[in-house]
């Protein structure tokens, strides 16, 4: 792997990876699902790294892998945009409502998030993490009861290129892991910015290949 996280590698189908993850298998599994929903209104398509603990998917990748990925992404100079956001997020589980307040601008958004489909890839002995391809609908809500159950503070750094945002997020607040000594949750995810504009099968394949690239970064930092 070269020093920079060079996304031009994804144009070369002969690229030999340190991780033997089968991207073609991933593509074949999720392409029909993405094609079914990518033109839906308010659709969100994301890929999240994590670990399965029974049926629960824990998206906390830990500080060391998180930092390793961030350092490598920051070395790459070909990003179209790098965005930093700080958010206060309030959740209500009964109807999946969340209120997000941008700490820098004060802008507030209210949505209801409903899961459409999860495709899980777990127990992969040749990859450092499990991962989940998730399709959801995030519907804007104009008027909402502001009684919420949970609150989180999120700091996010987003690396954007070719219709994909690689998001590195730290969260503080309510957590699923009550035994964790670190109050911070470290999350790595990728979101297709505008699913409607996926041009062709090759572009989708290249987007999905980023999962393998992230795993390669983690493999080379062991």
Regions found by a protein language model. Give the residues of each.
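Phosphate-end processing signature that detects enzymes handling 5′-triphosphorylated RNA
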Residues: 5-222
